[in-house]
Amino acid sequence: MVKAVAVLAGTDVKGTIFFSQEGDGPTTVTGSISGLKPGLHGFHVHALGDTTNGCMSTGPHFNPVGKEHGAPEDEDRHAGDLGNVTAGEDGVVNVNITDSQIPLAGPHSIIGRAVVVHADPDDLGKGGHELSKSTGNAGGRVACGIIGLQG
């Protein structure tokens, strides 16, 4: 079992996200995020583990095979497209995602990359906005953290 963790930090938003993968199976993503406005928020793995300029320096969505942005269940999607997480009235998200395109080992490993939560909902590439096919038009990056190996 490979395990990883990302501590999310933003101006008002914070959280801890855990990743685990057994063998070649899917990766399970769990944890919680607080300080969000109620509703949907885009949630993605970004290509770079660089936070020197805050969340802006984490680069685009992790996309090792050059696809367009989409929903987690779409065949045509960035590997890092994890869809939306939902914050309750208290601004808290409890994350529980299982995904097969974000491995913790191998050539497309997400270790050392960043996980980012966005201000707005991800339209899953279906919104018709000029940014729909690249970012899901999910708005600003309100918190991010670098995915690191865990013992």
Curated annotation (Swiss-Prot):
Its cofactor is Cu cation; Zn(2+). Disulfide bonds join C55-C144. Its main location: cytoplasm. GO terms for cellular component: cytoplasm. One of its GO terms (biological process) is removal of superoxide radicals. It comes from Zea mays (Maize). Homodimer. Gene3D superfamilies: Superoxide dismutase, copper/zinc binding domain. Belongs to the Cu-Zn superoxide dismutase family. Keywords: Antioxidant, Copper, Cytoplasm, Disulfide bond, Metal-binding, Oxidoreductase, Zinc. Its EC number is 1.15.1.1. It is found in: Cytoplasm. It holds the Pfam family Sod_Cu. Binds 1 copper ion per subunit. Binds 1 zinc ion per subunit. This is Superoxide dismutase [Cu-Zn] 2. It catalyses: 2 superoxide + 2 H(+) = H2O2 + O2.
